[in-house]
Amino acid sequence: MTAMNHIQRPAVMFVADSHFHLRPDPAEMRRRERFVELCRLAQRAGHLVLLGDIFDFWFDYPHFRLRGYEEVLQALDGVRAAGTAIHFVGGNHDIWAADYMHERYGCGIRPPRSLLVAGGSRVMLCHGDGMFKLDWAYGAFRTLVRARAGIAVAKSLHPEILFTLSTWLSGRSRCATRDEARVIESRAASWLAGQPAPGPVGNPNLMGRDLTEWDLAIIGHVHHGFSIHENGRTLAALPGWLDPLGYGVLQDGQWRQLDFDRDPTPDLATPR
C-alpha cells in the first residue's frame, strides 16, 4: 500500500493529572503555560481526552463558581473551536466538573470506565483511582466525591472547609517514588493478566458499548508512566502533567507516550 493510498485516522491526544490549583505557585504557572501550548497542538488532533484530575479542586455551588482556572478553560475553548472533540473523564479531584465540561465543551457524561473508538483502536478510558495504589486517604476521598451521599455532605460544607480538605489531599499528589512505581507496575500486570484476550472487531455500530472489548486501556492517577502488554491488550498509564510533562498520542493504532519538554512535536496533521 502506498502512502497516497493509506487513509490516516484523526489522532487522539491524552493528558491527565495536571492538578491545577485555584492559587497556583510560580512552578505551576509554567506548567499552565505549557498546557496552553499543548492545547494549541491539540487543535490539530481529532480528539483530546482529559483523563481526570486536570483540576485539583472543583465544586459547583448553587450560587457561585470558584475562580482560578480561566486560562486553562480558555485554552480548551480554542481546542473546541478548532473542531477537536474534547472528552472528559473525571478524576477523584475533579469529578464534579463533568456537568460544566459538558455544558461548555459538549463533552459526553462518561461513567468511571467507558470506551472510545478512535485513533484506530478500541480504547478503554478510566482515571484509575482505586485500581492499583492502596491509599486510605485517597480511598476515603474517592468515596466522598463519587457517592451521592458524599456529594450531599459536600454541598452542606462551607466552600473554605471543602477547599481546605482538598488542599490537604493535594499535598499527597506527587510523582510516584521508585518503590511505589514497582508496586504499581506489579499490580497493573496482575490486573492485565486477568483480562481475557479481546475479540475481533465487530459491528461498528455496536462498538463502544461492550466494556470487555478493548485493545488499549489508558489510565492516569498513579503519576507514573508505563505500558504493559498481555493477551493482545495494552495497559498504559500516563505519568501526569507534572515532572515530566507527560501526554499520550494514539495515531493509526500506534500508541506513544511523550514528554512535552523533551520529545519532538508529533505530526498530527491528519484529516478529520
Predicted regions span which residues?
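Short secondary-structure transition/capping segments
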Residues: 61-63, 89-100, 130-143, 221, ...
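Active-site-proximal loop/helix segment associated with metal-binding centers of metalloenzymes
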Residues: 128-198
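Phosphate-binding site recognition
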Residues: 121
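Core catalytic region of metal-dependent phosphoesterases/phosphodiesterases
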Residues: 2-11, 15, 20-118
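A short acidic, often aromatic-flanked loop/helix-cap motif at beta-alpha or helix-coil junctions
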Residues: 115-118, 243, 263-265
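Conserved beta-sheet core of the metallophosphoesterase superfamily
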Residues: 106-111, 124, 129, 133-141, ...
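N-terminal short leaders/motifs
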Residues: 42, 56-79, 171-214
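Metal-dependent phosphoesterase/phosphodiesterase active-site architecture
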Residues: 255-256, 262-272
